[in-house]
Each structure stands twice: as structure tokens, then as C-alpha cells.
């Protein structure tokens, strides 16, 4: 039996610019499930989930955490970030917030992940960036491929709950 902090498989860290690395990523169960606001459905399997999360983290310019750690049997993360925009659409990036719930199985492996990105327009942009990167690697219906530019809400939703970030520029 492994613990929630024990490494069973090491993922490729595509986001070395981020100070925080979630070690539960290196302990994905073979049948792990990833659900999130950026998906129209869910991803299953350690290889698929690992590939998705490893790349998705690379889209963050920074992560400012309000909280991360164990709460009972769950691991929780609450953070804000900035994701890159496109050349024609918010090239300086878009503010995005995420609340993550990590569930563990009886063996201590990461068995389910629920990621709640907000606001919706930023989550849809994030989904479209994932779609553009992965192409047909995953079912295209898993991602949003429409235009969010007319509906983008790009303002601070933190209500002062996050510390000011010194990481404001897209690298």
C-alpha cells in the first residue's frame, strides 16, 4: 500500500517555471478519473490523465495559492493563475481560478480529480488551448472549440482573498 505522497510513476514536468509541483501527480492509479470544467466529459487512465495535466500546467504563467494540502482524506488546492491568450485574443493572458479536489483509493493512489476552473470564459479558453495542443490525441468533443472572445470576463474575482502576485507577465 502506498501513501498519498509516495511516488509510483514520475511524470514529465512540463512546467518547471512553477514553484509548486503536486506530488499526487506521480501517484496516479491506473484507472484514475479526471473531471473538470474545461472538459465536456472526463478522462480516464493514468497515461491520459498524466499527459493532460503535465501539459495543462505548462499553460499557467504562475500559481498563487490560497491553500493546498490534506483535509481529512482529501487533498485540496485553491489557486489563481494566468493562462496565455492567443495572438489575436488577449495576448497578455487571462486570469483564471481553480479549486481542485484529489481523491485517493485504498492503496493511497490518486483515484479521482475534480478541477473547477472559473470564470467560465477562462475555462472555455483553457479548453480550447488544450484542444489546439492535443488535436486528435483525445476525442475532440472533449474540448470547447468555439470563440470566447466576445464573452471573456477578465477581471479579478478573488475579492482580495489572494495575495498580490509579482508574476503578471506572460513568459
Residue ranges and their predicted role:
Residues 1-171:
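C-terminal and inter-domain tail/linker signature
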Amino acid at each position: 500500500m502506498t501513501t498519498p505522497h509516495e511516488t509510483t510513476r514520475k511524470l514529465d514536468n512540463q512546467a518547471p517555471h512553477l514553484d509548486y509541483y503536486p506530488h499526487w501527480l506521480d501517484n496516479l492509479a491506473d484507472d484514475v478519473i479526471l473531471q473538470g470544467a474545461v472538459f465536456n466529459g472526463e478522462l480516464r487512465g493514468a497515461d491520459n490523465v498524466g499527459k493532460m495535466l503535465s501539459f495543462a500546467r505548462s499553460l499557467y504563467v504562475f500559481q498563487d495559492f490560497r491553500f493546498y494540502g490534506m483535509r481529512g482524506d482529501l487533498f485540496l488546492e485553491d489557486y489563481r493563475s494566468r493562462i496565455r491568450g492567443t495572438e489575436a485574443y488577449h495576448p497578455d493572458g487571462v486570469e483564471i481560478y481553480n479549486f481542485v479536489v484529489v481523491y485517493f483509493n485504498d492503496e493511497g493512489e490518486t483515484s479521482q480529480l475534480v478541477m473547477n476552473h472559473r470564470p467560465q470564459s477562462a475555462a472555455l479558453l483553457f479548453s480550447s488551448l488544450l484542444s489546439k495542443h492535443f488535436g486528435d490525441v483525445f476525442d475532440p468533443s472533449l474540448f470547447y472549440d468555439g470563440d470566447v472572445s466576445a464573452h471573456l470576463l477578465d477581471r479579478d474575482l478573488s475579492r482580495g482573498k489572494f495575495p498580490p502576485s509579482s508574476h503578471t507577465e506572460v513568459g
